[in-house]
Structures are given as structure tokens and as C-alpha cells.
UniProtKB/Swiss-Prot annotation:
Organism: Salmonella typhimurium (strain LT2 / SGSC1412 / ATCC 700720)
SUPFAM superfamilies in UniProt: P-loop containing nucleoside triphosphate hydrolases
Enzyme class: transferase
Record EC number: 2.7.4.9
Role noted for this protein: Phosphorylation of dTMP to form dTDP in both de novo and salvage pathways of dTTP synthesis.
Keyword ATP-binding: yes
PROSITE patterns the UniProt entry points to: THYMIDYLATE_KINASE
UniProt family annotation: Belongs to the thymidylate kinase family.
Binding annotation for ATP: G10, L11, E12, G13, A14, G15, K16, T17
Name listed for the protein in its UniProt record: Thymidylate kinase
Keyword flag Zinc-finger: no
Amino acid sequence: MGSNYIVIEGLEGAGKTTARDVVVETLEQLGIRNMIFTREPGGTQLAEKLRSLVLDIRSVGDEVITDKAEVLMFYAARVQLVETVIKPALAQGVWVIGDRHDLSTQAYQGGGRGIDQTMLATLRDAVLGDFRPDLTLYLDVTPEVGLKRARARGDLDRIEQESFDFFNRTRARYLELAAQDSRIRTIDATQPLDAVMRDIRATVTKWVQEQAA
């Protein structure tokens, strides 16, 4: 399908929206303009309804969403987006810039929730097969910094209201996974914004040039 699926990952408040803008600007400077944007969960009618269910704290009233129900909703939304939007776009040579993908589930549910990692890997492989992003930019930020930024934006969703311990476990799993996969590039998002933007530009530029070589 070509090397044109880039995903941006990170904790709440890591700066994913700013990073997306920098990625787009960098790609355009490299002559790439045929792009679409996705977010997870979401991106299709079904996936957006699932997003509301899993993130809106009021969506199911007083009913507690179990950890396994949560992860299955994420995967239902993901496979719908991948099969109906992402794969068709990639097949047509369109670049896809994604706000989150499967790494989020491996980190949040595997790290934060403590769901068995073998089960998550099996579920991922059953649902997605060998489909993976070509490049993932992981914006690394401490929960203290990230949640301070997120809370400054206003209302928090169901997952954003989790404890610092939850986000520390999530971050630890992100870092562990990033160290295991060369397709994941870690960006220090605790730096001043100019430095973060510089690192993103440099990483994307180098990667695109490597793919073209």
C-alpha cells in the first residue's frame, strides 16, 4: 500500500493537534498534498457512535463499562475505520494522517488498564492482521504536564478523568513499545514548543527521504 500512513500518539495534553499541523506543513513542503485525516475512535458514522459510548461519561448512565467491553468497542471502531476509510485511501495513493491508532489500545488498555498483553496482541492480529502504520510519532510527556494542559482545555472525557497512576502505567507501556519498534519515533514533548516542532519536522523529513531513496 506504500509508506504513507502516519499516526500521532501520546497521552492527553501531549500536543497531538499541533503535531498534526506540523506534519501536514512538512509534507506539503516536500510536495505531498493529497492527504486525509482520521481520528480514533471515530472517523465513520459507526465509529463516531462508538466514540461517544466509550468516552462520554454520561453515555450509559450509571452503568459501569467493563475493561473488556471498552477494548472491544475500540477495536470495533478501529476496524470499521481501517476497512472503510484508511485502506481505500492508501490504495489510491492518498496519505493518511491519523490521530491515534492501535498503539493507544496497547498502551492505555494494556498498560493503564492492565489487560493481558497477549490477549490484546491476539485481538489486534485477529482484527487488523498485519496492518500497521508506516510511521508513528509518539509524543512523550509526563502525566503531570499532559493532564495540566488537558484540564486547562475544559471538560475531561471518561478516560481523561483517570488517575495519575493510570497515566503513568500508560506512559510506561508507550515507552516500552516504542523501544521495540523502529517504526515508532519518540518525540520529547516536554520541550519548548519550537523544539518539539523542530524535532517533528526533522523526523518526518528524514523518514520521507528514506522512503524515497
